[in-house]
Structures are given as structure tokens and as C-alpha cells.
Amino acid sequence: MPKRTDIQKIMVIGSGPIIIGQAAEFDYAGTQACLSLKEEGYEVVLVNSNPATIMTDKEIADKVYIEPITLEFVTRILRKERPDALLPTLGGQTGLNMAMELSKNGILDELGVELLGTKLSAIDQAEDRDLFKQLMEELEQPIPESEIVNTVEEAVAFAATIGYPVIVRPAFTLGGTGGGMCANEKELREITENGLKLSPVTQCLIERSIAGFKEIEYEVMRDSADNALVVCNMENFDPVGIHTGDSIVFAPAQTMSDYENQMLRDASLSIIRALKIEGGCNVQLALDPNSFKYYVIEVNPRVSRSSALASKATGYPIAKLAAKIAVGLTLDEVINPVTGSTYAMFEPALDYVVAKIPRFPFDKFEKGERRLGTQMKATGEVMAIGRNIEESLLKACRSLEIGVHHNEIPELAAVSDDALIEKVVKAQDDRLFYVSEAIRRGYTPEEIAELTKIDIFYLDKLLHIFEIEQELGAHPQDLEVLKTAKLNGFSDRKIAELWGTTDDQVRQLRLENKIVPVYKMVDTCAAEFDSETPYFYSTYGWENESIRSDKESVLVLGSGPIRIGQGVEFDYATVHSVKAIQAAGYEAIIMNSNPETVSTDFSVSDKLYFEPLTFEDVMNVIDLEQPKGVIVQFGGQTAINLAEPLAKAGVTILGTQVADLDRAEDRDLFEQALKELDIPQPPGQTATNEEEAALAARKIGFPVLVRPSYVLGGRAMEIVENEEDLRSYMRTAVKASPDHPVLVDSYIVGQECEVDAISDGKDVLIPGIMEHIERAGVHSGDSMAVYPPQTLSQKVQETIADYTKRLAIGLHCLGMMNIQFVIKDEKVYVIEVNPRASRTVPFLSKVTNIPMAQVATKLILGQSLSELGYQNGLYPESTRVHIKAPVFSFTKLAKVDSLLGPEMKSTGEVMGSDATLEKALYKAFEASYLHLPTFGNVVFTIADDAKEEALNLARRFQNIGYGILATEGTAAFFASHGLQAQPVGKIGDDDKDIPSFVRKGRIQAIINTVGTKRTADEDGEQIRRSAIEHGVPLFTALDTANAMLKVLESRSFVTEAI
């Protein structure tokens, strides 16, 4: 069927900010879909609140609205734009839920907007647990016995009839939020109570646990003519019971017989046909390893994290084709863009193995609950491709960037057998490493399979890796063993460790004996047809398929897996850099390991290498491609850390040079540079041990800010107010970087702001100054940022511009740099300089209309700012006000404290723009789902040093009609200043403490600040946790509360007698 001509204008809903469970894969899907629809000649209108994505660039759709994805704003845009149709299946759970809400409120009918791709009934059937159960029974597809409950008591009664363990799954939540496995009634009560609160329809499904079955996923496509096919099947290394987003996954599935594959394939295809889904769909199944019994676990009637993985694993662009199917095209009419010759009706065939390993945020959250279950906790993932399981698994391990270069963590050798086996049985994020250690200790694959229900096939592969380790140890310098090790994915560094030599010597030995990798193409058809995609992976074998072209090339290093502190913003910069390289007439080559992002879409660059970002893997590509140079400043800390080893190996680093990167990163050199340039910074010292730190702090005076040098995202950074806390910090955090000392700085409580600058070595362009709403001490990535600045005087802005120019020229910056300042009493201090693109690049690029990463790349390749038409200095500011606000994923991470400080905790961001500060703030709060009603109660629990300031806020809340509650000390302070607050009890005062008021819905907002003694704050932590679990807005910085007050004041009426 040809494409539809009765619709012209289509609206696409994006997925909003990045949170755990909904990450960059939707930026990739949405970008592909919008371009795919434009290619067919439709007018595309996009709504998405996330400025950090490629998807919200002007070129992606005909009209891009960066507005909150809420009923209020989406309805406004629908009324204004009047599209013919709406495509909701590319915006993750956010997009689906929005479509449901628009439909239930009658907006779609009123405006005559048709839903494309997936019918509402199908969304309902797949998402509503009851309807899903009915449909499966009709299709005679087996599902675990289950019951829908709306109260805790119903749950307990049902569990009594089927027996424990049971699984709780709340309806309409994302990434398993609020669900979990329960081994007894106590756990069931706890999890169900929480799950009912988090489900928008207060219902949960209680089902028999089938933990221990194999978890298999099928990614399927269907069109309007009922053609359906399987794009890819995938098998989880971890059995059922661990969320698939937190599992190690292999594609294609490895341990199923042909019969089992056909059985599950038929089930998946019959389900997508019954749901009449037009587009992509993901079916998760559980297979009993000991019989041919299986269960259907769930169906996602949309593009998902698994479909991004399947697209990258097979090269088959699911989202692009889903968009074409949505407008009526069929699979036998669309050409597969990978081969350029076969139709999309061909099922992909793979002649390689793909491994995906999740990346978790626990390096940032040491207190976080690391046990894995049905609720997702990973922030991102890596993927690696190899010719065997060992190779793809080991390549994926070294892509993770958690300080490992093999499937082993050396410290585990010291763990006792009992502790080891406990970690093998009770899965945490690092279980793979514990299982590998158990094998090294001589536990047999059979024993481990019995304990973990991991298939023995995979455990044999781990045993094979260990056998090769032993061979290497027994035969140093042996070329045959070296070849075997390389064929199985071993890194030079691991081989060097076992041989007692250096990585460099192993590399030399390889090169002398021509043991080098070849690069194979990902072509969807197992090399059956010629393919035109330049998408490659390395392996040790015959025939290299990546042919170097005659054109001069430039290699751009990506930023690896998404984690806190290094998010999709860096991928954005990478993609823009590639566009500029191509525009300058070079061949652009990308190297990256993240399957979720736009940069690893094969149509973005001239060549894509899907490889770990390590020195060895990057050098192999450089040896083959011989590029003009490498650009490292867009890949975050990942790429910057590779600059020095690459330069030592004689590689040309384009842009700011290594010596100058060092001057910005190394503390002593940086201080010296600032002295020479006559720029003030807060007084500080370096310390290598506890005593030196204590001395430094006494000399500078408390409070001090302590942190290791060379880190991203404020890892292990703290504000310390007394010597006792300082000593405990030195004992726990110095491990963060043994070679690099700890920095001790005077902590200046002032107004913080930051600047991104672009320099060609002569002139410096400053697109804008962003002012932080939270005062210094909250990490810049967790602060709300406002552009243009609202409170900085002209003199301060001129000083900032002047210091920025001096620094850019003085540090020989070529390309991008980011500088953070703190201002106190009109005096400007420099806090830090990052000689690379920062996480504010996408936001600033969008609000100033300067494509910053592209401009920077053009400068790196030799053009000047004046040639590109930009002036020296601060760019004229916009008339509208734009706010970048952080979004957190605390609901997903038990035991992580939500108190904001110098260590970054947010996973994503949203943007609010309008004519005034108050309106822009309102949009930013709405977009980040911090909704405050216009009346209700606010509770204050404030540290002594902030009580004065809080009193003023409390008065203003009272003036607009809010009720004020406060904890004992705070209430007494308010009363002595003539403000009556209703006191609330201490934690543990049943029914009178804050958590119980929160549970009863009597509190609309909590304002909680923490004083100098961090140790005595367990109460505060419980209060903050209760706010997060019940979705009550929580402010741990008075400045954010003040911003929210401005919004409420601008929206409220004051009643006064005359």
C-alpha cells in the first residue's frame, strides 16, 4: 500500500528528560522517525522538553517545540498547530502515557487528530494488566498466574493462594518502577503499598514468580498489510527476575534449540498480529530450561531500549521503518537502507555475536542499594560485537569505563568464599565479576548454574577465558597463545599483566608479527548481499572489509556509555562535530561504544567503528585509517583521558594541545597560569594525605571544598565544615585517585555562573553567560541555570567576559572551553576550567542559535571566527528567558540520598522558555514534573545557619495562602519572630512525623536544608526519601524554593481589605 495522502501534518511526542529506564535510545528513535517522515514529504511538528538531544534541533522537524510534555502544554500546541495525526510510539512511556491522557480527555476527538502506529486499544491491551491477561487467554498464550489488586489486603490474600515468591508489577509505570520480588508477606506489604502509590491508576499485578527461567526477547515489526517479521531475538545472560534493562544481553539468542526458537517466534508474531500494531514491538518471554514450557512476560507496543539495541546489533533501522509503516507504507515497498538493494521484508541474519552490558551509577552512589530485581537501575549501556561470545563479552567489559579491562576486578581475590558465593547468588550490578572469580577459584560451571540459574553454556565460556589466562601465564611471549587470546577478545593490558611486561611491549610484539585486527562490516544479511553501510567492528581473523579511502579523514572519539555526569549532551556535541568535519570536506570517522545514541547511527558519519574507547582499540583504528588527526574535546572525560597516551604514541590531537589540557586539569599548573593572567581564584592547597589536608584546612579556614583532581561530574567532592568530617573524607575518598592529590579550597558562598567559550587562538566568542539559581556548592549539573543572567551587574558581566578571553588565549585554547565562576560582593573568582565541550553546549546552542560544536570544529580545522562571521567577545543576549533544570531518578535508586551538593546526581535535563523569568520557571518546573498546587501546606525543617532566610520564605508562602508546618526547632524560631507554624513531630512519632503526613497527602512541599554536621542527618534522609517516594516536591536548596515561590506569587491573587 503506498503512503497516505489524506494526512499532511504529523505531530511527534518526544520522551522528555533522561531518567533511568528512559534514556538516549528515544532521542535516537525520535530523530530517525522525524527525518524519515520529512523524507516522505510530511510536515512534522515535534514536542519534547529535553534540550540536550539532537531530536530537538531545528533541522529535525519543521517545527520544534521545547515545551513541557504535560496535558496543558501539549493541548495548547495541538490547538495551535492542528495536525492531522499524532505519532506517540517513539517517545517511550512518556509519549504513550501522553497519548492516553489526550485521548481520555477528549482532546484528540475534539480536534480530529488520528493516532498513528499503534491503536489506543492496543496500548491499553498491552499496558493494562487485566486486558493483557484476557488477550493472552484468547490467543492461548501462557502467562504466569496473576491477579490485579487495588489494595494491600487483596495482594496478601492472593499470595496466600499461590504461594511465595511473587512479583509485584504496578500498572503504567516505566522501567519497573515500584515493582519488585517478594519472598514473604512483610516484603509484599511494603512493595505493594509503594507500588499502588506510584501507579497512576493505583493498581498492581501480583503474579507467580518464574525467576530462574531463561529470559528471551523478540523484536518484531508489522505493517498495515499484516506482513510481520522478527528483526532480532535476544537472550539475557541473567535469568528472569532481573529487569532486562539491567541484564547482560546477547544477540542473537545463543542457547535455544531450533524448535524453541520457532515456538517463541510464532508466539511473538501472533501477539503483534492480535494487537494490530503497525510498527515495532518488543515481546519478552520466559522459557523453562528443562522443558518446552514458556510464558509471555510482557509486550511493549512501542519503540524501546531493546529496539535501539536490536537496530545497532543488526543494522536494521527499526524506528526509521516504524515511521514509514505508520503512514501506510508496507515492508515490501521500503528498501532496507543498510544494503540499499534488499527490501525491508528480509529478516536480518547475523554472522557475529553482540553483547550488551548495562552501566550503573553506583560509582557515584556508594550508599545505593545495588541488589538487582524487577526495577531498573542502570543509567546506560555498552555494546560490543565479536566473532564469538568471549570476544564480544570482554570487549564490552572494557567499554564500561569502570576501571576494568577484563572480566575481573582484582580486589575480589581477597573476598572470602562465603562472601563470594553470597554475591554470586544475590545478584548485584557487578555479579559477572563475582561469577568469573568463582570460576577462577575452581567452582565448576555445574555448581554455579545450580546456584544462579545462568545457562551452563555461558559459564563454560567464562571457564574458557580462565583457561586462556592460565595458558598465557604458562607460556610468556608465545605467539600461538597470543593469537588464541586475541581471537577471544583479550586486551593487550591483560596479556601484559599475565606476562609481567608492559602493554606497549605486547603491542610491539603483535605489530612485528602482524597479529592485528581486521574490521568486519555490519550488513544485516551475513555478507550475502553487497552492503553500502560503513559500519564496522574489529575481530582477529581473515579479510579486512574496511577499506581506507583516498580522502583525508578526521577521527572523533565519542563519550561511551551514559552515566551520571556524562550524559547525552556529549553525544550531541559529537554529532555536530561530525557535520562540521564533513562540511569542511574531510571524511568523518566516529568511534563509540554506546548503542543508544545518535552518534552510533551508521548514517551520521562516513565511517562508524563500534569499539571500546581504550588506547589499544583506538590505536588499532588509527593504524588502519591514518587520519589527519583526532578530536577529543567532544567526548567528555572519556575522550580527554585518551589525549595524553595518544599524543605520546605520535598521534596528532586536533584542537587544544595536551600540554594545555594539563594546565587546566593539573592544580599547580592551573594556579600558576591564573597568577600569570592575574585572575583571582578561591584560596586553596593540595594535599596527598590526611595530615596535609588538616593543615591546609586550618590555614585556609573552614568551610572548605575538597575533591580529587581530574574527575568529571564532581565525583567524590564534598563541602566540609569541620576537621572531624575532613578526616573521615580523606580516609574514604582519597582512593578516588591515588596518583593525583586532593584539592582543598576555601568554599565561597556566592552566586555561581558558567560560560562556554569558543576560541580560534586569536579571538574568543562567548555565546552567553548562564547564571545558577542555586548558590555555589551545588554541582553545576544539578543547578537550575538561567540565560540571560538576571541578577549580574554590567560590571560583573564585563569582568567575566574579560577573564574568559584571558583564559582562552592564555591556555592556548583551540575550540571549546567551559569556565565556572563564583561571585561574592561584586568580585569574580574562577572555580574551574574545563578545556572541552561541556554539558551546557546543547542548551546554549539552542537558546543562542549558535551551532557551538560545529563552530568549534571549524576552528579546530583551521578557520577563524571572523571568517565564520562571529565577533570577538560576548554575543548579544536574547530577549526571552531560558531555564535549564535538572531531572533526577531517585525513585529508581533506593538508599541514595537526594540532598544536593557538589557531587552530581541528576540524570537528565529539561528547558523552560518564555518572555519572563516567572513564566520560564513555571515551564521548567512543570517539565521536570515538580508540580505545586496553588494552595496547601509547606513543611520547613531548616538547619540553624539558614533559619533567618527561611523565615522570609515562610512569610511569603503564608501571604499567598499556604499553611506552614515546621519541625520543633524551626517552629520555635518562626514563633519567636511572630510567625505561627503548626509543629510536626520527630521521626518515629507515629502519625505526627513528616513521613506519615506525607503518606496521608497532607503536605504539598518540603523544604529541608542540612547544617554543618553531616553525620547527624539520618532523620533528614528519611524525610527526603518519603518525599521522593510519594512524589512530593522537595527543595534542599533555599534558592530553588525561592524560584518556585516566584512562580506561585506570579500566579496567585492577593486578597486585602481596603
Swiss-Prot record:
CDD domains: MGS_CPS_II. GO terms for biological process: 'de novo' UMP biosynthetic process; glutamine metabolic process; L-arginine biosynthetic process. It is an enzyme of class 6 (ligase). InterPro entries: ATP-grasp (IPR011761), ATP_grasp_subdomain_1 (IPR013815), CarbamoylP_synth_lsu (IPR006275), CarbamoylP_synth_lsu_oligo (IPR005480), CarbamoylP_synth_lsu_oligo_sf (IPR036897), CbamoylP_synth_lsu-like_ATP-bd (IPR005479), CbamoylP_synth_lsu_CPSase_dom (IPR005483), MGS-like_dom (IPR011607). Mn(2+) 3 binds at residues 820, 832. Keywords: Amino-acid biosynthesis, Arginine biosynthesis, ATP-binding, Ligase, Magnesium, Manganese, Metal-binding, Nucleotide-binding, Pyrimidine biosynthesis, Repeat. Residues 930-1058 are annotated as: Allosteric domain. Mn(2+) 1 binds at residues 284, 298. Its EC number is 6.3.4.16, 6.3.5.5. Its cofactor is Mg(2+); Mn(2+). Residues 133-327, 671-861 form the ATP-grasp domain. Mg(2+) 4 binds at residues 832, 834. It catalyses: hydrogencarbonate + L-glutamine + 2 ATP + H2O = carbamoyl phosphate + L-glutamate + 2 ADP + phosphate + 2 H(+). One of its GO terms (molecular function) is metal ion binding. Residues 930-1058 form the MGS-like domain. NCBIfam families: CPSaseII_lrg (TIGR01369), PRK05294.1 (NF003671), PRK12815.1 (NF009455). The large subunit is composed of 2 ATP-grasp domains that are involved in binding the 2 ATP molecules needed for carbamoyl phosphate synthesis. The N-terminal ATP-grasp domain (referred to as the carboxyphosphate synthetic component) catalyzes the ATP-dependent phosphorylation of hydrogencarbonate to carboxyphosphate and the subsequent nucleophilic attack by ammonia to form a carbamate intermediate. Large subunit of the glutamine-dependent carbamoyl phosphate synthetase (CPSase). CPSase catalyzes the formation of carbamoyl phosphate from the ammonia moiety of glutamine, carbonate, and phosphate donated by ATP, constituting the first step of 2 biosynthetic pathways, one leading to arginine and/or urea and the other to pyrimidine nucleotides. Composed of two chains; the small (or glutamine) chain promotes the hydrolysis of glutamine to ammonia, which is used by the large (or ammonia) chain to synthesize carbamoyl phosphate. Tetramer of heterodimers (alpha,beta)4. HAMAP family: CPSase_L_chain_A, CPSase_L_chain_B. PANTHER family: CARBAMOYL-PHOSPHATE SYNTHASE [AMMONIA], MITOCHONDRIAL, CARBAMOYLTRANSFERASE FAMILY MEMBER. Belongs to the CarB family. This is Carbamoyl phosphate synthase large chain. It comes from Streptococcus pneumoniae (strain JJA). The gene is carB.
